[in-house]
């Protein structure tokens, strides 16, 4: 409940900035995006402790969730100059929509955080037997081979993560949970 009370003023500030476009509002919007992302991580961290109570599997349109996650990150994506390549998706899948959206938001934020000079983010699907696999890939700086075994550990930021001040080491941990 307390997280939602924090998110309400963040959303209100974002709307005010969007309605009053000035030079300084762009920077404020980016900072609000970061604040919102950390708040989301706190919310999902709390939820991850009791997924059996929170997880709700339903039929969902994958394209809708992908486009919602892109919209969630529009200021980050625009500021970063990230080029998006999103494949048309007709698939419906059974999953928890809010968790899929959270995971996509984390992956998009990581793609922006660890981008190269001319960043590209690709989102597509492919079928594997009776499953639909959602593929999110970028051309970022990558993950050191020595860090790969630990990237899903709680609090682990890795070699590249330690160079970026906004790394918490909680995002991929929550994605895996």
Predicted regions and their residues:
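Conserved catalytic submotifs in the C-terminal HATPase_c
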Residues: 58, 83-92
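Acidic ATP/Mg2+-coordinating residue in the GHKL
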Residues: 138
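Glycine-rich ATP-lid/hinge loop adjacent to the conserved G-boxes
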Residues: 156-166
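Short conserved segment of the HATPase_c
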Residues: 143-155
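Short conserved segments within the C-terminal catalytic ATPase subdomain
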Residues: 74-85
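Short helix-loop "hinge" at the ATP-lid/N-box region of the Bergerat-fold HATPase_c
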Residues: 111-112
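Short beta-strand/loop element within the Bergerat-fold HATPase_c
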Residues: 118-130
């Amino acid at each position: 409940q307390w997280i939602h009370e924090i998110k309400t003023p963040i959303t209100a500030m974002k709307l005010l900035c969007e309605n009053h476009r000035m030079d300084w509002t762009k920077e404020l919007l980016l900072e609000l995006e970061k604040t919102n992302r950390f708040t989301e991580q706190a919310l999902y961290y709390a939820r991850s402790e009791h997924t059996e109570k929170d997880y709700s599997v339903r039929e969902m349109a994958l394209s809708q969730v992908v486009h919602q996650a892109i919209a969630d990150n529009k200021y980050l994506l625009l500021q970063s100059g990230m080029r998006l390549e999103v494949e048309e998706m007709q698939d419906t899948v059974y999953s928890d929509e809010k968790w899929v959206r959270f995971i996509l938001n984390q992956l998009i934020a990581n793609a922006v955080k660890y981008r190269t000079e001319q960043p590209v983010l690709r989102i597509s699907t492919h079928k594997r037997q009776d499953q639909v696999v959602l593929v999110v890939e970028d051309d970022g700086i990558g993950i050191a081979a020595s860090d790969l075994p630990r990237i899903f550990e709680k609090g682990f930021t890795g070699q590249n993560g330690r160079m970026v001040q906004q790394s918490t080491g909680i995002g991929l941990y929550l994605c895996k949970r």
